[in-house]
Amino acid sequence: MDLTQIQNPSFLKDMSISELEGLSEDIRKFLIEELSQTGGHIAPNLGVVELTIALHKLFDSPQDKFLWDVGHQSYVHKILTGRAKEFGTLRQYQGLCGFPKRCESEHDVWETGHSSTSLSAAMGMALARDLKKTKEYVIPIIGDGALTGGMALEALNHIGHEKTDMIVILNDNEMSIAPNVGALHNVLGRLRTAGKYHWVKDELEYILKKIPAVGGKVAATAEKIKDSLKYLLVSGVFFEELGFTYLGPVDGHDYEKLFETLQYAKKTKGPVLVHVITKKGKGYKPAESDVIGTWHGTGPYKIESGDFVKPKEVAPAWSAVVSETVLKLARADERIVAITPAMPVGSKLEKFQKEFPNRMIDVGIAEQHATTMAAGMATQGMKPFLAIYSTFLQRAYDQVVHDICRQNLNVFIGIDRSGLVGADGETHQGVFDISFLRHLPNMVLMMPKDENEGQHLVYTAMQYEDGPIALRYARGNGLGVHMDEELKAIPIGTWETLKEGTQAAILTFGTTIPMAMEAAERLEKAGVSVKVVNARFIKPMDEAYLHDLLGKNIPILTIEEACLIGGFGTGVVEFASENGYHSALVERMGIPDRFIEHGSVTKLLEEIGLTTDAVVDRIHTMIPSKQKRA
């Protein structure tokens, strides 16, 4: 079937099961071929082909509402709703988004990117439906990994209490990104092995009611028997205790079983949870056999071999530099513990996990818990290293404020994927952390200019015992610089001069330092002398350096790959104003006041005007012509 000719899912209504099975094969082949060129979340989507087709066949989108939790498993949904022809642009600038996007299609009713939001949003939609007295189905699809998020559990509790009509699809593939952890995962494991409970209890009730005269009374009395049967067949039926009708487990790749179960769910009043078992990566051997999450989301790859197409790496990944330095220090200090909220692979903590399994803690998708747990460990003299993506640190903000900073606890936060991350787009760009951390009392915030300075700042963080300290580091690789053998502590709040200059100064840090250096060199050739400063401590700033620099009364340009509002540049302007300097001398470059879409980092920087050319042009406008050297 030519998938690019699909305009909407209505064609599924008349298809037989054998035809649907053929369509499943076509979709898997299409995904494997297309994603080999663009990259993307291949394994989650290969696992939900039949489930997505079944949902679109039995329900009527967009009248019926599908909410894809996290959203990375929505590719099949996009194909069935007329977007197959756009897959060549997947996750590229102004191309097809890798997550549901309301402006893309009326079938995308809820935008996602972070996990565990679908149930709360679905409850909102269901309550709105009931208030408006309409009849559509509301169907959140949530994975077993996302179900460990506290927000999802809060929503389950509320939905069950209110007895709201809703069909929750639990897509259980036993993995989120990496293998799942936690007690809830173990509950689901027991449910998988006790899948006959729902059908047995219904058959029992049906048979008892057929007994003449006394059947109804016996059936009523049998409720107690049925409850006992429930605990006999399923050890701890978590969802029914919350008020849901539990259906399953059902094979998520068997159309007959899916149709039977979903039709039953449509007829059932109140909240229903359909437990669907799927195989992540189904239909592509390398992805299907992956047990650690390598094929969850990938770049381009070779279909035949399963080898990833990567440029030759001349420098280590930032995540590896940080995690391996922490590991090196942990060998000499038993107090060091690594913590991750379900991202051991992305944060490059596999080596730490292998060497110190008892000191590497993966809490699952539970950022709030991870953060306060780290705080608790710090009260007992441990040295917790919390490795967390910038975008996911947002989910634990109150814990950083209330539990870490307020108590001034020695927690080292590794803020991975800081700055623009590219293809995952606006839900994942790490551009807000400076603004929401800079104003917190007791917080120290750093970002290195290269991987060598990065390892020294990790060492600095582990030696620091005066409160919380955070290190920002980017996605991707470092610069390939020489790495010192011996680690050293860098004095807190100190900057360094990278290039001397007399007519203007650039203050920057991290990934924008090469841009600043190149701009300064070009300006030098044009007769403009520009100082470049490595402002590696975003907080506290080097106040002595700033006093000296502002006292020279020369233009100052701050550059940051982070949002301008409340950012580093704002801090420099505030310092100038509060200390009697001419704050108009300071201009800022950074991320504007909007969400940044998906695309390559290079393209996005160009689009927002954060390039070497833009820096050169800005400096020229800041320096009066008469001050420029001939």
From Swiss-Prot:
User: What GO terms fall under cellular component here?
Assistant: cytosol
Q: Where does thiamine diphosphate bind?
A: 72, 113-115, 145-146, 173, 284, 367
A GO biological-process term: terpenoid biosynthetic process
Q: Which residues bind Mg(2+)?
A: 144, 173
Q: Which SUPFAM superfamilies match?
A: Thiamin diphosphate-binding fold (THDP-binding), TK C-terminal domain-like
PROSITE patterns given for it?
TRANSKETOLASE_1, TRANSKETOLASE_2
Q: In which pathway does it act?
A: Metabolic intermediate biosynthesis; 1-deoxy-D-xylulose 5-phosphate biosynthesis; 1-deoxy-D-xylulose 5-phosphate from D-glyceraldehyde 3-phosphate and pyruvate: step 1/1
Catalysed reactions, semicolon-separated? D-glyceraldehyde 3-phosphate + pyruvate + H(+) = 1-deoxy-D-xylulose 5-phosphate + CO2
Return the InterPro entries for the record.
Answer: Dxylulose-5-P_synthase, THDP-binding, Transketo_C/PFOR_II, Transketolase-like_Pyr-bd, Transketolase_BS, Transketolase_C, Transketolase_CS
- GO function terms (MF aspect): 1-deoxy-D-xylulose-5-phosphate synthase activity; magnesium ion binding; thiamine pyrophosphate binding
- State how the cofactor is bound: Binds 1 Mg(2+) ion per subunit. Binds 1 thiamine pyrophosphate per subunit.
What are the required cofactors?
Answer: Mg(2+); thiamine diphosphate
Keywords, in A-Z order: Isoprene biosynthesis, Magnesium, Metal-binding, Thiamine biosynthesis, Thiamine pyrophosphate, Transferase
Alphabetized SMART domains for the sequence: Transket_pyr (SM00861)
The entry's function note states: Catalyzes the acyloin condensation reaction between C atoms 2 and 3 of pyruvate and glyceraldehyde 3-phosphate to yield 1-deoxy-D-xylulose-5-phosphate (DXP).
Per its record, how is this protein called by name? Answer: 1-deoxy-D-xylulose-5-phosphate synthase
Q: Which organism was this protein described from?
A: Bacillus cereus (strain G9842)
Q: What is the lineage of its organism?
A: Bacteria, Bacillati, Bacillota, Bacilli, Bacillales
